[in-house]
Amino acid sequence: MWKSFPVFREYIRYTTASSVYEARLAYEEFGSKAHTYSPAYTDTDFPVIMQCSSHITFNSFSQFRRFYSMVKASGEKISCGIRINPEYSEVEVELYNPCAPGTRFGVTADLLPETLPEGIEGFHCHCHCESSSYELEHTLQHIEETFARWFPQIKWLNLGGGHLMTRKDYDTEHLISLLKGLKARYPHLEIILEPGSAFTWQTGPLVASVVDIVENRGIKTAILDVSFTCHMPDCLEMPYQPAVRGAEALPVDAIKTALTEENIYRLGGNSCLSGDYMGSWRFDHPLQVGERIVLEDMIHYTMVKTNMFNGIHHPSIAIWHTDNTLEVYKDFRYEDYRDRMSDGN
């Protein structure tokens, strides 16, 4: 949704990127060079990464050694860093736990040399996912205990993303206190946060329609014109059951013992994947074909992970302005599907 960047520019000046395309989008459309991190850079992508980045974090010293000479020779003003792994995270879902045992992310303290290589100016870590300031407090304790002896050698500390500071119960005053305390202890360090999904938390529903209702062994499924597999993959991967406007989310297995008069439905996607369905929801009326189903909070970690499996039609992307007008950003067409696999005519 790069067309919404003017809104973001009212609040922030910088962006982050994890790939060459994200870095280009940040540079060309947002208008700032990105703080870029990737698990691995390639010879093909790295020249463009340098053009579009103010900071580049390397996942390993082997990657740093491979590409740092290119940074020096480029003439670009780029600050390089290394991703550290404090081996501590309170993220419970392993899919999103960057510090899980055996993770491919970052360098542990036992592998850091006492004297950092020339050119390493910062540390980057990412240990959170929709986390509170209190989880950050615990993480900082581990980082300082483990890595503080290297702090005199660096200029910046990037605490990554996953800070859900726009959630209603997030303690922003506690966050401010933590950051001020950290800065007081290490006044030479620039402290960086990448709040990520906090910018779009609870800002974007996915509006679907019921296209059929089927019943098998007492389980009623409302088949929608969208797909969990294609349009909401995070729901299946986590997994988590999204909020549906006007419906009560029930335990997943509740539908297996539901009575007909209870209006309890499973929601099914319109792909051919057997597992393209989710949960149990109780509605206050029997669902009808053509009825709208609004799935809440479907922007972050959902819209960006969509795919075109089965050639399923993608939902359009639009913004609802404060003057009550709707602006369509992207209306997906057959050509978008066709041209992903071969160049169009």
Residue ranges of predicted features:
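Charged (often Lys/Glu-rich) extended helix/loop segments that serve as interaction or gating elements
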Residues: 178, 193-345
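Feature marks short, surface-exposed loop/turn motifs that line or immediately flank catalytic pockets
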Residues: 88-90, 129, 165, 199, ...
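Active-site-proximal beta-alpha core segment in soluble small-molecule metabolic enzymes
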Residues: 1-156, 170, 178-181, 185
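Glycine-rich beta-strand-to-loop/alpha-helix junction loops that act as flexible
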Residues: 126-128, 157-166, 195-198
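Short glycine/threonine-rich loop-to-helix capping motif typified by GTGT followed
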Residues: 2-6, 133-138, 166-175, 202-208, ...
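Short, small-residue-rich loop/turn micro-motifs
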Residues: 84-86, 161, 228
